[in-house]
Amino acid sequence: MEGALQVCRNCKRRVASNHLGLHEAHCLMYLVLCPECKEPVLQHEMEEHCQGGHQQVGCAMCQQSVPKHSLDSHEAQECQERPVECQFCQLAVRLNKVDLHEHHCGQQTELCPDCGQHVMLRVLARHREECQREQLRLQKGKSIPVPESNICCHYCNQMIPGNKYFHHLDRCRRVSGAVTPSPVGKPEIPPSSPLSWAAEDQTSKAEKDVRPKLKNRHRAPFLSEKSTRQAPRGTNKTTNLSLKSNGKLRASSPVEDETAYDILRRCSQCDILLPLPTLNHHQEKCRRLASSKGKQV
């Protein structure tokens, strides 16, 4: 059959059946198989073929000896010292060190152009895909639930949800009498709970929080109601507060007055937290009220 193919016994090539006899006669006369690469070579070129094609040469990168005819494929596919490109910084790195290089290189951060966050290079591609999906969802009007954060109230030291913080702060400020937190560096006394103050108010009208809204309002209770004297011109009009200590009156300087308002103490009768200058005056009223209740009972 004219289209059938047969294998030549010398060069092992497939030849058409009708040309096989002529091909084998020519092949046996002029061609021989190379013992190294098993390729048919002309007899008079065999020596040159073996010296040029099968000569061992050293790889310039790994110094490994390879046949000269396979040097190109070795350098392109097999050599472990061949340069490859880092997927993060696009620099040329040796193949046997690229894993370690990319591990450290991938830990560097880059600014995400979509959300503005700093993201590590090794997860940047996945982050951008997720970030772009989130941006599309936001543009379509679909709200993404955000975890609610808690804020500490500096009046009652309770953790309040962020969406209720300002409402709680306004209410807590009114209940606590707008006492500002202690400054940094000064002793800090934990305030009593607003719930305890509310309970005291319901128990007795007399046992209410008498702390003033402003420090200057404490000046009037310590002035004698019968005194009609006025401070002469040119003198300091600030009224000095007096504190009772061991049964004696002691005048305090303006600086001491200011610091005294930052010190809070509890009333021994009703346990209300009050600034130190008003505590003694309040305790006297509490004692009188307690004694009057005892007589009634």
UniProtKB/Swiss-Prot annotation:
The parts of the chain that form a coiled coil are none
Q: Which GO terms describe its molecular function?
A: zinc ion binding
Which Pfam family, giving just one, matches this sequence? TRAFD1-XIAF1_ZnF
Q: What is its main location?
A: cytoplasm
Q: What are the recorded Gene Ontology BP terms?
A: apoptotic process
Q: Where is the composition biased (Polar residues)?
A: 229-245
Ranges of biased composition (kind: Basic and acidic residues) = 202-212
The Gene Ontology CC terms held by the record are:
mitochondrion; nucleus
Alphabetical UniProt keywords: Apoptosis, Cytoplasm, Metal-binding, Mitochondrion, Nucleus, Tumor suppressor, Zinc, Zinc-finger
Region Disordered, as annotated, extends over: 178-255
Q: Where in the cell is it found?
A: Cytoplasm; Nucleus; Mitochondrion
Zn-finger (TRAF-type) residues: 22-99
Transmembrane ranges, per UniProt, are none
Q: What binding partners and quaternary form does the record give?
A: Interacts with BIRC1, BIRC2, BIRC3, BIRC4, BIRC7 and BIRC8. Part of an complex consisting of BIRC4, XAF1 and BIRC5; the complex formation requires IFN-beta stimulation. Interacts with RNF114, the interaction increases XAF1 stability and proapoptotic effects, and may regulate IFN signaling.
Tell me, in a sentence or two, what this protein's role is: Seems to function as a negative regulator of members of the IAP (inhibitor of apoptosis protein) family. Inhibits anti-caspase activity of BIRC4. Induces cleavage and inactivation of BIRC4 independent of caspase activation. Mediates TNF-alpha-induced apoptosis and is involved in apoptosis in trophoblast cells. May inhibit BIRC4 indirectly by activating the mitochondrial apoptosis pathway. After translocation to mitochondria, promotes translocation of BAX to mitochondria and cytochrome c release from mitochondria.
Q: Please name the PANTHER family in this protein's record.
A: TRAF-TYPE ZINC FINGER PROTEIN-RELATED (PTHR16295), XIAP-ASSOCIATED FACTOR 1 (PTHR16295:SF17)
Please report the name of this protein according to its UniProt entry: XIAP-associated factor 1
Read off the lineage from the record.
Answer: Eukaryota, Metazoa, Chordata, Craniata, Vertebrata
